[in-house]
């Protein structure tokens, strides 16, 4: 068993400690023959006390770890979207800010000009097609997505023009820390960004 698998199994043990019904309410998720199901990173996710499955495939790597961590720490509270929070404004985030920008924001910058044409597809895939970004959100466009049921990310995109290069900023829903520790939030944003890039690559082929 790999290190990731050990951590995933430990997190799932904590997640299911109070029973599947209590966990289903916290996630929230549905109980079914495959386990507890809910959307995660644009795929159908199924949890059992033994494993995490994304899109029907057993996930034993970093994404599986993030999902298991969410399951282990999610609170019964409701998601509060506003005010959106920058990663740098989260407590104790200073040592991780460089890595966050490198992994969650900068990878989208070279393809910022493609985002408007792919926006609907991205929102549909990541559960952002039912809610708009908060009124007054800056940028040329924004993407409000839900990589996990109670964690929202808002990507603010500035398109390149004659004076300024493109830029992308990723913000979190107001109480995201209620449902995930800091390192898990950084990883959530990273893997959401990777999924957005995958969607754009799929759409261009």
Could you say what each language-model-derived stretch is?
Residues 1-34, 64, 70-130:
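Short Lys/Arg-enriched alpha/beta "domain-start" segment
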Residues 23-49, 132-159:
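Amphipathic, interaction-prone secondary-structure segments
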Residues 43-67, 158-183:
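Intrinsically disordered, low-complexity regulatory segments enriched in Ser/Thr/Pro
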Residues 59-83, 173-205:
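Ampiphathic alpha-helical segments that act as solvent-exposed interaction surfaces
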Residues 88, 147, 152, 156-157, ...:
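Short flexible/disordered coil segments
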Residues 104, 108-109, 137-138, 177-181, ...:
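Domain-length accessory/inserted modules outside core catalytic folds
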Residues 119-134, 181-190:
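Short secondary-structure transition/capping segments
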